[in-house]
Amino acid sequence: MNRRRLGNSPLTVSDICMGTMTFGTQCDEKCAFEIMDRAYDAGIDFYDAAEMYPVPPSAELFGRTEEIVGRWLKTKPRESLIIATKITGPAHGWFVPPVRHGHSALDRVQIMRAVEDSLRRLQTDYIDLYQTHWPDHGARYEDVLEP
């Protein structure tokens, strides 16, 4: 498996990132473990999840994919994997994400809450790559980044 540097970071990742958005709905935990094991055995070390997965999103299933990935992570050396996950920002129009009890703003409080929740579901003490699923056009990023 070829590898490349992840942006300007010191991380190197497999050329292929294993997406997990259907784990917990279309693909049960047994199926998900089989897929992730085969990917791992093929040299894929880069796995992507999100707090709102699986799809289609629902309040009942919110976070299930991260839970499945977290249980699978316990079967592998954590340092051998690059784990990416995402925070869901506020959507517009017909879809309201069932996240954080309806609090989907990307302010400092919600970002910290989402990170802690993802760490718990993933059963790890760090996330290698944390991204936003949707931007929050109302967020003042200067306020978010201030300690």
Where are these regions (language model features)?
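Generic beta-strand or strand-like secondary-structure segments
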Residues: 68-72, 86, 110, 114-117
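Short catalytic/ligand-binding loop motif for oxyanion handling, primarily in non-cytosolic enzymes
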Residues: 25, 54-56, 91-93, 138-139
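Structural motif corresponding to the early beta-alpha repeats
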Residues: 52-53, 75-104
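Short beta-strand segments at enzyme active-site cores
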Residues: 46-50, 82-86, 126-131
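N-terminal binding-site loop/beta-alpha segment at the start of enzyme catalytic domains
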Residues: 1-81
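Glycine/proline-rich, positively charged
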Residues: 94-147
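Active-site beta-loop-alpha junctions enriched in small/polar residues
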Residues: 21-23, 52, 86-90, 132-135
